[in-house]
């Protein structure tokens, strides 16, 4: 099926999802684009996903604040208008710096992030997660947590 043109404005955004303390607004799912996905992600200081990897490429563009990205165990602080590209299989995480921040995210072909974000938002309550349950949920969506 061929994708159709569409426009998404702030007035038509779907409600934000709470994904482990990060607010995720889905702008385009792979169903809409027939391939890639686009989200806005924001959070307060210290918020961000634990180290993980997945089977799709992912790129982030820092819109606001400072964000510490860890890529294959090496950390770097990124400010506004910085692009971070992560090929499939790259172990990565990020944490928003002082004052919080906001990211624009695009996944590559085969991305399953928006479905995973929706499930985490619905099935994982706020607070410290049940790690075995979270690990299983993520694995069902092509994401592997890198614990320890």
Put a short name on every predicted segment.
Residues 1-15:
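Hydrophobic ligand-binding cavity/cleft-lining segments
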Residues 7-10, 31, 61, 73-91:
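Short acidic-glycine-tyrosine-enriched beta hairpin
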Residues 14-51:
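A short glycine-rich, His/Asp/Glu-containing loop-to-beta-strand
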Residues 40-44, 53-70, 106:
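Short, conserved beta-strand element in jelly-roll/cupin
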Residues 99-148:
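Double-stranded beta-helix
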